[in-house]
Amino acid sequence: MVPKIYLSADRLLEDSFRLGNLVFDSGFRPTHIVGIWRGGAPVGIAVQELLEYRGVQSDHIAIRTASYTGIDQQEPQVRIYGLGHLVDVLNPEDRLLLIDDVFDSGRSIRALLKELKDRCRNNLPDEVKVATVYYKPSRNVTDLKPDFFVHQTNDWLIFPHEINGLTTDEIRAHKHGADIILR
C-alpha cells in the first residue's frame, strides 16, 4: 500500500512560496494566474502574493475542474467551470500561469488547456505554463509535465483541508483541530 503523507497547512504554504520562487527565478512573469479550485486555489493565492511582493502584477482568478467521484475514482469527462473571464480578457501577448496543488493524472490540466484553446482560439496566450507543488509522474496519463514543481512523489497525499475518507483515528492523529472536526 502506498504510504499516506499528511500535509500541514504551514508546510503547504511554505511550499507554495517555494513554487512562487521557482516561477520568479525562471524569469517567467505571468500576466494572468489561475488557481484550479479546490487545492490549487490556496497555492495560487500564495504564488500570486509572492510574485506581487517581487513586483510582478497579474490578474488572478480561480476556476474549477471536476472529474473525481471518490478517492482515486474519476469520470471519463473532465468538466470545467468559470472560464468566462479568461476567454474575455486573454490575448496572445499575455503570459498565463495555471496552478494546482498536485499534478496527478494530468487529465484536468489537459482538459483545461484544450478548453482554453477551443474557446480563446487566436487569443490564447503564446506562453502558458503549469505550476504545482506536487508532481506524480508515475500517475501521469498524458504527455504533459508541469513547468514548475517543488516535490516529485508517488505517495498518497492528504492535504490540510481533506477529512472525507479518513478514519476517526486518522483525524485524531493527523489533523490540527481534530476536536472541532469530531465534535
Can you describe what each PLM-predicted range is?
Residues M1-R183:
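PRPP-associated nucleotide enzymes
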